[in-house]
């Protein structure tokens, strides 16, 4: 219990409390301002809309006008964000609140409530009430995950989406309609997190869940596009440009040395670029590694014996491997690694049984680097010249130490696939 208390204090101090001190500018302000622009018939992806609809109860940053005029706002600051139009429909309840500060505090309160709901659901579906020691360990580990701390401090939409994703997975068997609606919301806000989950449900042939989810998503999309069409807003070109610029040279999504914050990314290209030194080769290598792991996952998935009543532990292992692999090929920031709650749950479940315990312990060791924002910390130490030049320029520092979180994800994916293979062998032999 003491471990949980310490982890909870760390979570509150490094998460919600930090957010309360950064209300003037954070990751949530741009999506809300863009939603206000959408509601008023303006282009939500146009930098000028940010200045026009910026909340009056907070100070507008000085860089907003200067970077907007110079055309570097997206490259330098990542705003306007390239969230899909469906996100504006879902964020409308916060955008219609006149006071930004009230909306922001309600947002962080809702995210905290969803996080707590996810913790309770983990205990219920994982039957941790019968294995309290493992349940306490899991609770402390989830509270200690640095991606959640970073996400809460920034007000990132990811910290709302990941608990929704977990609840959708937990309820997929017994509450298909609820799970489908939650999945649609996840895709509407962050497609790169929601689509792998929908793909998993499709492979499980949960057709009712799939159709309900796609129907809800279609309704949300129609509302979003119709509002833009009624006002004759030429949004599509700016949306495409925002996505292009976000991943372009020198942007916050750039995985090369042109982005001084690149080690805050966790996609595989950060690592492959350090190794090969060429953007095109890094992209090809990153996609190839993720593709190979994805094919291995599919092979093991279809080799898994079919069961009418799927075992929660095996389902958690399977979806854990899928989510870890999904983090590798495309743009993901550090807080998206909050998806590591899935392998954390499985690892704590695996500790109960001797045959799986080894894989579970190795998985916990590989998740350990994510209890601190290591890449960002090392990046700041290097930038502040706290790391000797001889060390900072050495191959082992650049290839192993700086991208250590990506190495951990790669190895974790391999361990989870190995655990899937071991489970399949055990089931087939019995």
Outline where the language-model segments fall.
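Aromatic-enriched
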Residues: 350-430
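Primarily membrane-embedded glycan-assembly and transfer machineries that use lipid-linked glycans
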Residues: 1-179, 201-334, 397-398, 425-430
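Membrane-embedded alpha-helical segments of multi-pass membrane proteins
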Residues: 109-114, 159-164, 190-194, 339-343, ...
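Central hydrophobic cores of alpha-helical transmembrane segments
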Residues: 182-186, 212-219, 319-323, 359-371
């Amino acid at each position: 219990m003491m471990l949980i208390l310490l982890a909870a204090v760390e979570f509150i101090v490094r998460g919600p409390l930090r957010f309360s001190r950064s209300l003037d500018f954070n990751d949530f302000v741009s999506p809300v301002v863009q939603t206000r622009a959408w509601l008023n018939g303006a282009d939500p992806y146009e930098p000028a809309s940010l200045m026009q609809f910026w909340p009056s109860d907070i100070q507008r940053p000085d860089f907003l006008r200067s970077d907007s005029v110079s055309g570097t706002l997206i490259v330098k600051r990542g705003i306007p964000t390239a969230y899909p139009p469906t996100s504006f429909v879902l964020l409308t309840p916060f955008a219609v609140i006149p006071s930004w500060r009230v909306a922001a505090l309600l947002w962080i309160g809702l995210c905290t409530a969803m996080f707590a709901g996810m913790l309770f659901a983990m205990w219920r579906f994982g039957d941790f009430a019968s294995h309290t020691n493992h349940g306490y360990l899991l609770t402390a580990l989830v509270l200690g995950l640095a991606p959640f701390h970073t996400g809460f401090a920034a007000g990132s939409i990811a910290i709302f989406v990941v608990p929704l994703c977990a609840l959708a997975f937990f309820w997929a068997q017994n509450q298909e309609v609820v799970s489908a609606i939650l999945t649609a919301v996840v895709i509407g806000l962050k497609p790169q997190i929601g689509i792998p989950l929908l793909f998993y449900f499709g492979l499980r042939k949960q057709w009712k869940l799939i159709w309900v989810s796609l129907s809800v998503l279609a309704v949300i999309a129609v509302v979003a596009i119709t509002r833009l069409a009624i006002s004759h807003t030429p949004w599509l070109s700016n949306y495409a440009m925002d996505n292009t610029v976000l991943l372009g040279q020198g942007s916050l999504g750039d995985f090369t040395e042109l982005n001084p914050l690149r080690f805050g990314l966790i996609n595989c290209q950060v690592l492959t670029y350090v190794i090969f030194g060429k953007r095109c080769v890094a992209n090809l290598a990153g996609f190839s590694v993720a593709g190979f792991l994805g094919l291995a996952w599919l092979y093991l998935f279809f080799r898994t014996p079919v069961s009418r009543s799927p075992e929660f532990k095996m389902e958690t292992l399977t979806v854990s491997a899928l989510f870890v692999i999904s983090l590798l090929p495309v743009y993901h920031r550090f807080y998206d690694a909050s998806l590591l709650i899935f392998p954390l749950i499985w690892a704590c479940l695996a500790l109960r049984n001797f045959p799986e315990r080894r894989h579970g312990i190795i998985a916990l060791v590989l998740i350990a680097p994510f209890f601190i924002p290591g890449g960002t910390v090392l990046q700041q130490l290097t930038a502040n010249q706290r790391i000797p030049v001889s060390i900072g320029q050495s191959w082992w520092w650049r290839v192993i130490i700086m991208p250590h979180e990506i190495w951990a994800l790669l190895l974790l994916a391999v361990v989870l696939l190995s655990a899937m293979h071991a489970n399949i062998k055990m089931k087939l032999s019995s």
